[in-house]
Amino acid sequence: MSTLHKVKAYFGMAPMDEYEDDYYEDDDRGPAPRGYRRPREDRFEDEGYAPRGYDGHPEDRRRDYDEPPAYRAGLAGGMPGGFDDARFEARMRAPREFDRTPPRFGAMRGSTRGALAMDPRGMAELFEAGSPLAKITTLRPKDYSEARTIGERFRDGTPVIMDLVSMDNADAKRLVDFAAGLAFALRGSFDKVATKVFLLSPADVDVTAEQRRRIAEAGFYSYQ
């Protein structure tokens, strides 16, 4: 059989009657059963073609699959229509800056009204010299052992803002009971102005509900 016929036979392009018998003869294998054709790699193993799944040269198989397709090289080299096109250069390479939604509450700055409004002049009058609350002090005890300091300030006639926010509930409750008893014994007043914040007022200091509200709104932390 000529080389051309062998090539045609290998690719299955030659008619069955043109095949020579040596393509079907195997030394250790009998002829294929009637109606059954051996796989191509088995039929042509004797002609120098290795069977599928061989382990002899794995690098050859890697070379077949690792080579990038031709079109990738074209795109990398600036092929028209790719991402290197001038149409996409600025859009793809420059980071896009997304539009930011303006703050929803920006227009409300400086426009607080009502009970939460700060009146600097009113607060100055509330704590100005000669006012009953002019010498007010804020104490932030860490535990019950500081009850003595609260009692001494109150006994000297100083209004005391008692901030118990940093205390645990058990000690805070003990200190509230102490302050309430102290105010009762010295004929003063004991009022709540915020959560875990109380105002102890001596007997000669009359603090109205409006003044207590202003103290809470102005931020009692500013008055030491």
UniProtKB/Swiss-Prot annotation:
GO cellular component terms attached to this protein's record: cytoplasm
Compartments in which it is found: Cytoplasm
Residue ranges, compositional bias (Basic and acidic residues): 54-66
InterPro entries from the UniProt entry: Cell_div_SepF (IPR023052), Cell_div_SepF/SepF-rel (IPR007561), SepF-like_sf (IPR038594)
Pfam families in alphabetical order: SepF
Protein purpose: Cell division protein that is part of the divisome complex and is recruited early to the Z-ring. Probably stimulates Z-ring formation, perhaps through the cross-linking of FtsZ protofilaments. Its function overlaps with FtsA.
Family the entry assigns: Belongs to the SepF family.
Protein name according to UniProt: Cell division protein SepF
Organism: Mycolicibacterium gilvum (strain PYR-GCK) (Mycobacterium gilvum (strain PYR-GCK))
